[in-house]
Amino acid sequence: MEKIYQQYYTKSNEIVSYMLNKLAIRENSVILEPCAGDGVFVDALLQKESNIKIEAFELNINEANNLKKKYYTKPNVSIVNEDTLLYNDFISNKGKNRYDFIIANPPYGAWQDYDKRNILKEIYPNLYIKETYTTFLYLCISLLKEGGRLVFITPDTYLNLHMHTFLRKYILQNTSIEEISIFNSSFFPGVNFGYSKLAIITLVKNRNIINNLNNKIKIISGFKEPADLLSTTNARITYIEQNDIIQNENHAFIYSDDEYLNDLLRFPSIRIGDIADCVTGIYTGDDRRFIKVKDHSVKNSKNYEIISDNELCINTVPDLNGYDKVLYVPIIKGGNTRYLKNDFWYINWSKESVQFYKTNRKSRFQNSQFYFKQGLAVPMVSSNSITASLINNRIIDQSIVGVFPRNEEYILFLLAFFNTSICTKLLRSINPSANNSANYIKKIPIIIPDYNTIVHINTLIEIIFSLKKVDGDYTSIEKELDNIFNVIFYENRDKNISKRLQNELFAI
């Protein structure tokens, strides 16, 4: 579909069946479909119950005309070719408490021109209006009657991302959430978001805030295929009170199917942000002009110039203000590499270039106090697991989160931690999307073990360094580190949570 609409039609029979079952419509009801598309939900609603009234909105005039032809003989179906988010009756009191049921697959990330953005900001001042689906969700909750039911399928990003804090609080206080089912976007034929999963939320409008906060949400995950939505036998089910969620920082849906990790996430004694600075790096404003690459075998390097030996800065003390002549220094860009990362990219560090980075409106000469320092490079976008490598006194670009421990003795210990499965599990519980921004990394709980345990971990990391330099196999050492951190986090778990004590795990 065109970017302006950004519609992904619900072509999965299993998803449609699941959503209709959760909606649980009854006869003589008034139902809203706020973004009808080709009418897949309207068809399913009519098959489920014929004695209902459906109001279907569709912005795309061609689709709206097709719907009018399709339901010409159905007097109980009205098609409205309007922008739901700007429809006058909806944004005035006329639209409030109007519908018994609402079902939708709203557009995700549809482009809004700047004039429309300004209008939406005035109407929905507390929402992140660049993301269309969340605005639909907020509006439609206000359109429900008391006791009315809503079922939406959307990306799951609103459950955790900071920009949706207001929306989460609104939902938690004004509705009782019955169920949230989370699954891969690939369940939609022809759709696969790399940045998030999809979530189907079922909720009931409720003005009683106390009842809402005492409500337990059923969160279902672990689906293998669309058919699993119709039977949760093999799925993972977690229950969490809305009151617990609203007490989380930014009211985020921080949860895990592991009850202990849930407690650790909600009541950590120490977070990464307590012991380390987490920052993003530089943006030149014009990377192809100022950055060069080692050779074109490097991923995504096709349009970059290859660095020559006489341009490299060698044996020169790093200078934040740049050098008198054109010299290039190593910069770490994105890409998931564990422990050690070779020099592949180089940034122009002449005084003239540095001045450009500082003054150009597109450039970001940010967090410069951490340039040329030792720390950890964590790619901001990762796929299956979090990774980290040593910065080794290089510069990081904006695709990297730099983690700089305030106590240097923790550098190798944290390097090991960020490459373990439990770190990935904790971060994905805080933010299930592939975006590992600095603000989320700061929230990861960490348990600092005894001195001898840290020494043992550091020794294993040094062995990995030696093996990486000769292309040796270090998988057994990684497994040992994974086991050690499982012991750190799970051994004496009652002490970790209740008494906040640190464990003497490997003390001699």
Give short role names for the model-derived ranges.
Residues N28:
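Phosphate-coordination loops involved in phosphoryl transfer and adenosine-cofactor binding
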Residues K48, L67-Y71, F417:
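Alpha-helical interaction/dimerization surfaces of two-component signaling modules
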Residues T232, R236, T420-C423, S498-K499:
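Periplasmic c-type cytochrome electron-transfer domains
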Residues E259-D287, Y304-D309, L327, D450-I508:
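Non-catalytic DNA-recognition/assembly elements of restriction-modification systems
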Residues D263-L264, S269-H456:
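Polybasic, glycine- and aromatic-enriched phosphate-binding surface used to engage nucleic acids
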Residues K3-Y18, K22, C35-N66, N76, ...:
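Signature of N6-adenine DNA methyltransferases within the class I
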Residues M19-I25, G109, C140-L144, R207, ...:
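Proline-centric
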